[in-house]
């Protein structure tokens, strides 16, 4: 059989060969036989076949050939025709065993497509359809598919088809619903047999014909999709793309002066309802002219969401049909650019195309802004994008105002839009909401906002008086009308009116879209009526047309485009009318700058700065740039103007958009931000180096700043400040900048000198203060400004002081750097700089924070990302976000991120964020808003990005992302839970009981404190069944589970804590000495209580003794940390935030984590104990830090929580992590986790050791030993507490992020232990510049990576270690321009670990940080350190004795992993 089977092929080959041989020209015959092959190849093939056949068969074939040679040609032909074909019997039998062949499937596929069509009102019986198919196959001799396979093909052809059972009872049949037979069946196209022979002639024609048919089919399908999408977006039916294009042109959604528009309009009368294909082609032509615009517009808005959701075809379609995307995009951007900075030059097709790329947002708004604009702008209507229909140009003034108001929400919307479908819905509503209010409020100013964006820049056509409104930025619409911004401000926090409304605006700044709510908190603070707050929005990504490459990236990356939109929206400048003339100049200058700089920064809108006269002391240039794009792309920053009424030019450079897009368009939801953040960080570091990333459009070309930028490269934080100036010099933008600057100078020399640029470098929010005169504005001025600015006094005293301090050093970039580092340790460094930048923009940040972390989420996250550690943290969330599979996970992720980011920022930000975050849940909180928001942005730079509950761009999380459920209970509650002490303090009572505050019962509000809280009794019983989504949220893992939609059954105890226990917990927290914590005490205690109870019932398979010992540790820790109780509080606060998490099935573990390595490490299969551990070590860490920010703010006074957050978040987080670990994780794991903790702990130790470690000499060893917390009894407990404190920073999983946070935390902690201890009060908030300087010294030490392990352990260098880690992280970030990438890797790794081992990756390694880089050196030192070895041995012993039987018995993989 085998021989026979193999005979035919050789025969076939040979027979043909024979013909050629007999023929004079055999060469010709062979090719004919094998048409595609030349003679040599055919021979080679023949030899190959021959060699593959056995000798006997070859001999047989040779014999046959010899006989065949005797045949005549006719006989040979007959033989050839008679040769058997098809499969051999053996192959046939095999084939039958198979389900079906590709050919059969194709036959069935073609038959189904040619015979059936969709029709919503008819159904076809399945059997009838299959019988027809079978008869068709029988007629043609095909082998029919089985009924099951045929059904699968049917599903592929008609994915929307559903099976229904129709008919009377007893006679029902299964039918395909929505199908019918085609009335006319087209003749199937047959392949062109002459294809090869014809050569070029026919070959070109035939294929082109076929391709054309295919293209037409695809194009028509794409057109259908686009029309369907347009109908949803515009609430108006479109049968063809031509109709849609006509509508878009008619309603001025796009420019009317382009050839495509003219062509469409000319063709419209003839037949609006043209054939779909023609309509498709028309759009194509149209798209060519409009494409840039179209592309740009869609990316920022719903279009993106829609596209993402829809098939790629649709995306192509959108690009094809610029009108559609343009419309959608225009719609959103227009609404966004309320400032009347309609960037779209209506009459300017050429400009339009570049503009769209660079500035999606601006393009849309331009039509609406002004009558003048209207002429220019083709799409005036877009302003009303919320409605889907736009107001006509005629409503220019009102529209513009509406836009500016709307803009704020819009931008956020845009941001969300780019990341996910959730954006579109959000977009729509916010659009609709802002429209009415905005129109009424901002109508007056609208004229100023003339959009000249049609060209990348160009001056505003608006009168000088309206200069302030005018935005020069080509992409950014920066004309926020200062007229009553109250309502508008609410709508668009970013649009803070110059008037007193600014204050309100600060409060309002809730981000409607998760994307960004940049508010001009400062502006509002500045309550100077002239629109003192100039909102300058620089969207780096939007950048200028100049940055086409970048823009392209942005376009390609949806995130980026939205970012641009946001920028346009946010780029609203409120300038006092008095300064109008200058602003206009500046505006132009800025535009030029943008052009000059390839950077993404739009020309800064100096206009705002011009307000100087109006600003007087109050005026703060509030750059409310909201991160329109996903979370990070850019954050709005507001810089308070100098005392001398100078609005610093805050330039928001969002490099992140570009990077971020690349990093994660994903989702990004926030996820995209990660990479961008890293990149941004890198960009910040190397402002000049990365044209795309760096938005060098620094207002002030300060050579001194150049140095700063260099330093910044090392330390992303630093970069933010320093870069601005030097980059300007470096970059072409310089002249433009200079021009801008003169404007600024005109306004006020001091103001000029300190150009405050709010840059979003990468994810980092950079407020670049550039001073034209090197020293003229610098520290003193800055300090003055900070002090003068209302924002400082109002709520953000703490932050402002820090800011001041940093600013004071600003002239000296290094000094600034130093101060920053000192302030925050390594993380603080970044943050500090951001702080400096943000200080002025604190109100904005506050607002953003207020806007429930939306903006902070994005902007701050960026900030943190800038700082290395923070970056890591930030990115983890993003990774998680990218990974997240479900909405729930997304929400959890967001919460996690929020908490984590908050904690990051928090650590960096002196815990101001804490308060801010607190506000996030209650963005409305006006009183706290300014301070809390301020803090929040600062501290939760990273936070908001991932989990911007308010309007998470990436995820649609409720504003109070911090605590969706119990966490959300009350902003104040979450705050109190979140108080820094709360976290760490939590450890004392609750952690003692639970072994870790993270173990707090999920249901309990305090459960946030215990990120690692056992998921809940239910979860404990079946960790896999109900793993908290946020389990890997670092601190808040468990808490998220508890606070989120946890079923009541899940946390029965949480709801009814013992009064005794509550009191005990409260006392413990209060005892920590943090009034704020005490205020929050109940919540934390509640959490602890619940935690304790859950813990006991759950037991997490962790021996009770382990549990007890851990509680002991926590208690001791508490006692030890008492002096630094704020730190502990911070931890608690962090927990609170995390608590927001939802309890979700385990599978979500990895995907949902937004917060840090820990977040990634949700344990899926690991026993509850492991899970707890994980939460503690990996997730808990960051979230703890994060939460504190948000939670603390609402509680009591924003100030205290802030302080607590600063000092406590990191240390507490670490301590808690360790405690939890020891409690529920095997020593091995703990050891592994602890090492990084110990290292970072040491970093933190500097301050902590001073305060606490001084008493814990042995504790230092234990800081390393902390790995095996279970180790011991009271002595160990005390050590454990210390280790927790120290380890907080070093936890590997979140080592980087935590390090950054911890460093800052420890710095502040030590600096202002009294503050920490104090009850909430402004005192805490405002750290004196002296403290900051001290911190800077510490920071310098931290920078010293060479400090030995012992030094770190000693506690003097605790911060040093942190700093080193942070530094390494920043270096890594610099090295890997895409820090987020690395982070993502880590995240993926952690995810893998989670999935594989359900082990906390933190235990194994720190995904949050580039592994082995920063930590490895320290780790090596530790390994060599006798203390460390001792600890390790003790840990191991304790592990064996601790009773990790659960690991042995339940989690073999875990044990193996540990081993």
From Swiss-Prot:
Tagged with keyword Nuclease: no
Organism of this sequence: Mus musculus
Name the record gives this protein: DNA-binding protein RFX7
Function: Transcription factor. Acts as a transcriptional activator by binding to promoter regions of target genes, such as Rec8, Mxd4 and Ddit4. Plays a role in natural killer (NK) cell maintenance and immunity. May play a role in the process of ciliogenesis in the neural tube and neural tube closure.
Compositionally biased intervals (Polar residues): 404-416, 482-502, 562-578, 634-645, 706-716, 971-1009
Positions of region (Disordered): 1-27, 303-347, 404-428, 482-590, 634-659, 688-716, 918-1016
Keyword terms, alphabetized: DNA-binding, Nucleus, Transcription, Transcription regulation
InterPro entries: DNA-bd_RFX (IPR003150), RFX-like (IPR039779), WH-like_DNA-bd_sf (IPR036388), WH_DNA-bd_sf (IPR036390)
BP term (GO), one: positive regulation of DNA-templated transcription
One cellular component (GO) term of this entry: nucleus
Pfam families, per database record: RFX5_N (PF18326), RFX_DNA_binding (PF02257)
